[in-house]
């Protein structure tokens, strides 16, 4: 209906230029201008277009509506807003929406936004009934409440189960107070439990990550909140400043201020390079590390403790090497140097002159220097 409707009988066309309304059983559409093509069962609307449905409303500059299929086609800036409690809204400039099935397909630029998450991609499919979105090509899933953005070639987001995953050149960016963590893996998975107040993201296969004060590689990795614990699994290696950290299992508490604590379990090993042929080393069953201002400052060794560290004079020249064995140890670190060591329970320590033993005889069991695997930049995580 309209205050003034012009109808062309031979062409079976009608139009209005001063606000009109189109209604069916569930939908009410209004616009300033409208053109109805009866033979094509198509209506074109422009200027202040509003489509209202019990479940949603569409606000657009212009759209075409196919009356036989109840499909809205968008060719300009469009916003689809859910009227339910989930507050989901969609933005697009090119795509279509099946109003009967509540399914849509959008082409770039596009975005689906829920309470704390947004999804976008070159192509985006969204089912308003199941609350499932699928994206293809330059996919981005952002969790605004956790400062996490996941990107890749293919993505999936389920609002009901609060899960999402991305594959293909997958990258996770987690913003901290001072810098950002960049992580790559074959597949990235995120899940949120709103009732328990817990969220997690997991990386599977070929994990590599870079942060200004922390880098690492492993097969799989998980991070949970609110405990802020990162767990590395299967051949994990971690680097902090000049220290290389390995163990069968590595667990770290990393908050917005950076790394705080470190737990190494089974075959625990920390080493740093003294010079081109010499290495400071610590090994044991279990290690508990503590960070100060983002740097590993102290390590408590529990079980089968061993250490090798080099001593220097006031000018930095090597004077000797300390080889110690003790069940438990407390070691203080200053960068790549051991600044203090306390041996607990039956200590056995020897300080050798620097030239008495060749460096090859001072490599502890389990030593391996893996610097070639270390990610050196954001781009290097894709190596």
Annotated model-derived regions:
Residues 1-383:
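Structural signature for solvent-exposed beta-strand/loop edge elements and short helix-capping sites
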């Amino acid at each position: 209906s309209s205050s003034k409707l012009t109808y062309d009988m031979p062409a079976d066309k009608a139009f209005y230029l001063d606000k009109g309304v189109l209604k069916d059983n569930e939908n009410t559409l209004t616009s300033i201008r409208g053109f109805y093509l009866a033979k094509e069962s198509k209506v074109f609307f422009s200027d202040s277009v509003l489509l209202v449905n019990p479940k949603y409303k569409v606000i657009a500059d212009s759209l075409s509506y196919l009356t036989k299929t109840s499909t809205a086609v968008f060719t300009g800036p469009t916003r689809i807003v859910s009227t339910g409690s989930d507050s989901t809204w969609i933005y697009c400039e090119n795509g279509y929406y099946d109003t009967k099935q509540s399914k849509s397909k959008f082409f770039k630029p596009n975005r689906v936004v829920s309470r704390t998450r947004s999804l976008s991609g070159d192509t985006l499919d969204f089912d308003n009934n199941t609350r499932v979105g699928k994206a293809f090509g330059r996919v981005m899933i952002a969790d605004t409440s956790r400062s996490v953005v996941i990107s890749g070639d293919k993505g999936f987001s389920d609002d009901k189960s609060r899960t999402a995953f991305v594959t293909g050149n997958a990258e996770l960016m987690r913003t901290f107070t001072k810098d950002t963590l960049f992580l790559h893996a074959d597949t990235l998975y995120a899940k949120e439990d709103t009732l328990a107040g817990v969220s997690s993201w997991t990386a599977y296969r070929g994990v590599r990550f870079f942060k200004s004060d922390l880098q690492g590689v492993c097969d799989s990795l998980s991070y949970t909140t609110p405990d802020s614990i990162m767990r590395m699994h299967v051949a994990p290696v971690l680097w902090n400043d000049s220290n290389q950290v390995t163990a069968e299992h590595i667990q770290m508490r990393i908050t917005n201020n950076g790394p705080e604590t470190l737990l190494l379990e089974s075959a625990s090993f920390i080493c740093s390079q003294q010079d081109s042929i010499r290495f400071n080393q610590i090994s044991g069953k279990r290690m508990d590390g503590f960070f100060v201002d983002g740097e590993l400052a102290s390590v408590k060794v529990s079980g089968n403790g061993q250490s090798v560290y080099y001593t220097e004079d006031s000018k930095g020249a090597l004077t000797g090497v300390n080889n110690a064995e003790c069940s438990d140890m407390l070691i203080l670190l200053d960068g790549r140097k051991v600044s203090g060591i306390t041996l607990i329970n039956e200590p056995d320590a020897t300080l050798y002159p620097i030239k008495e033993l060749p460096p090859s005889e001072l490599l502890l069991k389990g030593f391996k220097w893996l610097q070639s695997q270390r990610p050196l930049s954001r781009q290097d995580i894709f190596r």
